[in-house]
Amino acid sequence: MNIIELNNVTPAAFADISRIASEVWQSSLAFEKGKKYLVSAQSGGGKSSLCAFLFGYRADYSGDIFFDKRNLRDFSVNDWCLVRQRQIAYLPQDLRLFGELTAWENVSIKNEITSFRNDSEILEMFRKLGIEDMIGKPVGKLSIGQQQRVAIIRAL
């Protein structure tokens, strides 16, 4: 995927607001591959909604969202599975880790499905994030910050 485009998107929760003070909603916007973007808003401003729309968890919006010129409303379940396996990752506020499994097992569960990384690449991510010594520990015994890093590795 090279570009994500939003065209006059408005979350259903904001449908009754004629003009939203936002650079994301009710405007044309493009996110290009390889660039970094900061989406900042007050509580209730729609940051989590945007992520849910882009990951296909929710479709309660008006307007159009495109991945490489393809409207998300046209995606089948299989299309979403393929996109989530290879092209987009989402780290929810609820980390959705399995507390009784080790950090390595939590990451391996997704990688067994996608085969996206080999073991040495995954080990290098643990090292870069400073938690290589936590690989064999149950995630439920790690600090929240350490759990977040495990979830980041799994998402990548």
What kind of region is each of these model predictions?
Residues 63-72:
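Conserved ABC transporter NBD signature motif
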